[in-house]
Amino acid sequence: MQPTDTMKRTMAEVVAQRRTEMSPGRIFAEACAAKGTDAVVEYDVTITDSLTSSRRKPRYPARNMIKVVDLSKDPRRYYWHESLPDPGAPQVHEADLRREAANRFHRSPVPELLPTTAWVQVPPDLWEDIETFESFINYRLIVRLSTAENDTIIRGAGGLLNMPQIARMTSRGSFSSTILAACNEVEQMGGTADGLIINPADYYAFMGEGRLMDDIERNGVFIVRTRLVEPGTALVGDFGHGALLFDAGRSVIRFAEPPPGTFAEPGGLALMAQIHERVVVNLPTNFFVVSL
């Protein structure tokens, strides 16, 4: 597993490369200048993975925690996963020491990818200023798409929090926090707890009370702060080896009619961005939803 400082250097290299490329917003803004509201741009990348942030304080999306499988470049039929042994299953040699030795192995088909969609209302004539329209697409439409993607990965119909095979942990045992207890439990299963998804309210409460968040991050745990985890809970797991994000490797931006209730005020031009993806867990025994 990469140390946090190595991961940050790698991200800096990615940022430097992306600054030399045309942004998704620029591509669409130029298409709109040429075709007006008939403009449709289909990208051969997932656009939530193609933007860089100018923020001095990063806030990472959930997709950055998980190995992404771009099915357009790396087609798959199946994925493997494990489960705990059935009650009464035969004893496995040294499973009391190496718990994972008793796990069962499975093969499942790659599930149907789910659409993730975001909408914005375009202020009148904004597209006439290409630079401003580019910024609006990049930092409103695609940022909203990133939020919708977090929902797909974390709490949507196929999201991590809705997977019944991921256990809940309410007791911290001999540790000072259930987060640390879960990290230990993952390692007792032969994995490494390399990721934490936590509500900002709890993240900053821990910051004010002590050094837990700093200690966890210095220990190499990648932290995602998001409203999509209920306050008082967090998700701890082996994201690097224990989960996959299947990705279509395709995106689209176009003008379209939004569903009712999308905006506070009806009317005006609506712009839609959409991607397709699905998260799966290979090692559900290496994830815990903890009560803080």
Give the positions of each predicted feature.
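Assembly/oligomerization interface modules of large self-assembling protein complexes
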Residues: 25-116
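Helix N-cap / beta->alpha transition motif
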Residues: 42-48, 123, 198-202, 225, ...
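Short conserved micro-motifs at the rims of enzyme active sites and ligand-binding pockets
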Residues: 89-91, 132, 207-210, 233-236, ...
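Alpha-helical scaffold segments that mediate packing/assembly in large oligomeric complexes
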Residues: 94-189, 288-292
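Extended oligomerization regions of viral-like shell subunits
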Residues: 157-277
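Structural signal for terminal/edge beta-strands and the immediately following C-terminal loop/tail
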Residues: 275-292
